[in-house]
């Protein structure tokens, strides 16, 4: 996945979307997401996909996001959609309804890169 293409599409959709390299600690971020967060930290990014907002979480808020959604037992949450977490679990990207006693994972992509590519394709 060419992250620059994703960033360009996000900014083309809404010029207020802001990315910048992350100079802080990203140890919490899984290895497969580190290149994206290191080079294109989503400081303030919300995408509209089919009329639904997807908010990518900036690096400095990731720790709090994990705590907020700890009840779903996901490996790593990196975004939300109308309050529903979007997360990486065993390499795949999933979502589930927030606030439920027994969350049912819904697979969105086979990998983080595939998920970003799908967002690029859907925001054309």
For every predicted segment, state its role.
Residues 102-123:
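Compact, glycine/acidic-enriched structural inserts
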Residues 96-97, 122-124:
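Structured catalytic/translocation cores of nucleotide/phosphate-coupled proteins
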Residues 83-85, 89-100:
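Short, compact, well-ordered microdomains
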Residues 48, 100-101:
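Short glycine-enriched loop/turn motifs at secondary-structure junctions
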């Amino acid at each position: 996945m060419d992250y620059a293409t994703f960033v360009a599409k996000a900014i083309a959709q809404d010029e207020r979307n802001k990315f910048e390299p992350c100079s802080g600690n990203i140890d919490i971020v899984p290895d497969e997401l580190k290149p994206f967060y290191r080079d294109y930290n989503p400081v303030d990014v919300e995408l509209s996909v089919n009329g639904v907002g997807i908010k990518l979480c900036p690096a400095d808020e990731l720790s709090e996001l994990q705590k907020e959604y700890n009840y779903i037992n996901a490996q790593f949450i990196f975004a939300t959609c109308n309050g529903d977490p979007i997360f990486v679990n065993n390499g795949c990207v999933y979502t589930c309804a927030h606030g439920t006693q027994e969350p049912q994972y819904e697979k969105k992509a086979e990998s983080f890169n595939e998920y970003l590519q799908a967002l690029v394709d859907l925001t054309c």
